[in-house]
Amino acid sequence: IYILFLRGEFMNEKIENLLKEDRKFPPSEHLIKNANAPSSWYDEASKDRLKFWQKQALTRISWFKEPTEILDDSNPPFFKWFKDGELNLSYNCLDRHLESDGDRVAFYWEGEPGDTQEITYQDLYERVCKLSNALKKLGVEKGDRVAIYLGMTPEIVVSMLACARIGAVHSVVFGGFSSEALADRINDAKAKTVITADGAWRRGDIVPLKNNVDGSLELTEYVENVIVVK
């Protein structure tokens, strides 16, 4: 009992220490300059909220077909915004930034055991296009489901954007799940393609992702192709 008590005291002290956070992470000047919404926006939105959001949507999003209807509130609480517009998420995340910000870093990645990457919009665009073209060559079409079973690597971002680019539906499966759990999710989604890796670092160990996928294939009949990151 005494040992448990001491351990409990230690754990309580550790929890309290974690609750006290004194570090500061100041935002960049660029972020500060662009973070706050001007007061004129509030005035504009209060006068005509639908017109305000129409303006924001048309100026801040790239459309293949601009919407003519702002809000469909005919079936509350199932509201639909810009329902007759057409766009592509991957295009808005990547293509629209290339001309002015192609060399700008889209995101920083740090993995185990300490490797890092700085991925620009141009780099990400090229990777996404390469994978989306590969998916199309494998017969993946709009509406098809793709299971993504990866570690926390840049390829998981590439995979999601590549699916969005061709209209495929991606289903991200946690890389720590077993073959059985992965198979359950493949079957639920009826995924015809799986994107995985030969392995992934997690808490100092390498998770055998590809081996887990191989095990899941024995429990599903939907998968036609497996793409492996090495």
Which residue stretches match the model-derived regions?
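Short, Lys/Arg-enriched N-terminal segments with co-localized hydrophobic residues
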Residues: 1-10
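N-terminal amphipathic, basic-rich helices that act as targeting or association modules
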Residues: 11-81
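A short N-terminal helical cap/helix-turn-helix that marks the beginning
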Residues: 46-65, 85-107
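Conserved AMP-binding/adenylate-forming core of the ANL superfamily
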Residues: 90, 107-161, 178-183
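Glycine-rich phosphate/diphosphate-binding loops that line cofactor/substrate pockets in enzymes
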Residues: 98-100, 135-140, 184-192
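Structural core segment of the AMP-binding/adenylate-forming
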Residues: 165-230
